Swiss-Prot record:
It comes from Human parainfluenza 1 virus (strain CI-5/73) (HPIV-1). It comes from the Viruses. The N-terminus consists of a long intrinsically disordered tail. The central part contains the coiled-coil multimerization domain (PMD). Forms a four-stranded coiled coil structure. The C-terminus constitutes the alpha-helical domain that binds to the nucleocapsid (N-RNA complex). Residues 412-445 are annotated as: L protein binding. The keyword Phosphoprotein applies. Belongs to the respirovirus P protein family. This is Phosphoprotein. Residues 344-411 are annotated as: Multimerization. One of its GO terms (biological process) is viral genome replication. Essential cofactor of the RNA polymerase L that plays a central role in the transcription and replication by forming the polymerase complex with RNA polymerase L and recruiting L to the genomic N-RNA template for RNA synthesis. Also plays a central role in the encapsidation of nascent RNA chains by forming the encapsidation complex with the nucleocapsid protein N (N-P complex). Acts as a chaperone for newly synthesized free N protein, so-called N0, allowing encapsidation of nascent RNA chains during replication. Residues 387-416 form a coiled coil.
Amino acid sequence: MDQDAFFSERDPEAEGETPRKQESLSDVIGLLDVVLSYKPTEIGEDRSWLHSIIDNSKENKPSCKADDNNKDRAISTPTQDHRSSEESGISRRTGESKTETHARILDQQGIHRASRRGTSPNPLPENMGNERNTRIDEDSPNERRHQRSVPTDEDRKMAENSNKREEDQVEGFPEEVRRGTPLSDDREGRTNNNGRSMETSSTHSTRITDVITNPSPELEDAVLQRNKRRPTTIKRSQTRSERTQNSELHKSTSEDSSNLEDHNTKTSPKVLPSKNEESVATQKNNHNHRKTKYTTNNANNNTKSLPTPEHDTTANEEGTSNTSVDEMAKLLVSLGVIKSQHEFELSRSASHVFAKRMLKSANYKEMTFNLCGMLLSVEKSLENKVEENRTLLKQIQEEIDSSRDLHKRFSEYQKEQNSLMMANLSTLHIITDRGGKTGDPSDTTRSPSVFTKGKDNKVKKTRFDPSMEALGGQEFKPDLIREDELRDDIRNPVLEEHNNEPQASNASRLIPSTEKHTLHSLKLVIENSPLSRVEKKAYIKSLYKCRTNQEVKNVMELFEEDIDSLTN
């Protein structure tokens, strides 16, 4: 932390006090002479002036007890030490020479002024009140340079090391605390000392010089509480780190709690003890043991009460996420995307898994992460389906082309087979029609293969035979058919018309024949009459049986009488 930046943040209240605090160089030189004139034995033995100041401050002890809460708040936490360790390390390397000289002057001024004002009625509550109001937000660069430990047998060592510590304080060098490790330049030694780092008495901050006063019982309690080990705070930091490493769901809530704790540590006032205060504080370790117990119990209660709202919120989020997952499964079942709700819960497809994670996410960061994963998985699945469809279309196109080629070849083959079948049918037809013979089947005579001009075919002349007229052209027919046809000597004109129609040629209609047409017309007249069907058949039969015109006339007269009887 830069020194100029630190002085730019001073309060107007502190600026008003600076003219009073800046004293001449002669006072500082006088203070150095007084301190150097003491012998080590005198410094170790004579402590009557310390006891006199403590007795004077006992008169105002009830007023000091009113600020117990403020003293508890003045105790620094490991988060403060870890927070300010890196800043103090950086600033110590950059401006070490300036800060040490300036801090030595102010430190000597404060000690000299405290020795002169030793008879003040109530120095500590006034200083504590000023410290509470000013509220130092950041640590000074010269603070927390070395570790501290719990003092146990320090009364014996105080007398031995008092001379050395006094000289170090006057010279401005950082002292080495009893039972503590020596100074180390690396940052890890300062950050990992579990809150045991101790602020040196030399500081350049003008706002906190009032704190460096003569010791009092209340200030000793604060020093003891600072030097006390706090395993509960270590456990709290460990549990916080484990929570952030194990589960990402509690990340946002743990950040909020850590930010809140940093804010509290920044706004809490700080008390910087001096060497004399630390020496007197060792004598009252047993007296203030109960107070340190009370503070550690409070710290335990605070640490126990912190993670409970986080677990409650996560439980509520899990309950709501389960209901949202169930609602999503029901919606998918109703839309027909999946068959059952159980199938959605057991499904291992990427989009379904990301959807379930998104519905169960605790904050917006995880929700957006899972939403992006779901969209990418859906896009990937769609691309896979598109590729599958493309391959299927290619296969179908190839099959269509091959089927076209097959159809073309098959049609050509079919045409060839059809032509062969037609040729075979034509040859079979010729063979069956001629009976296996190429010539005329009716011609039984043998015809010469070569015709000459000199020869002509002679027509065979048949002599007249009177029996040929009776036989007609039936000389080759069998006797049964001939006998059947010759048996009917009576010529029936109706039967003759019916039988001779298929054999009649076109020239036969030119010959006048009155009977055929009259019988046909009479038949049509009888069929169109209103008589019954049986009567019509009877009249037609009688017409066919008529042999002369007179019989036909008689039949038609009877027909007319029946028609007249029906009409009348």
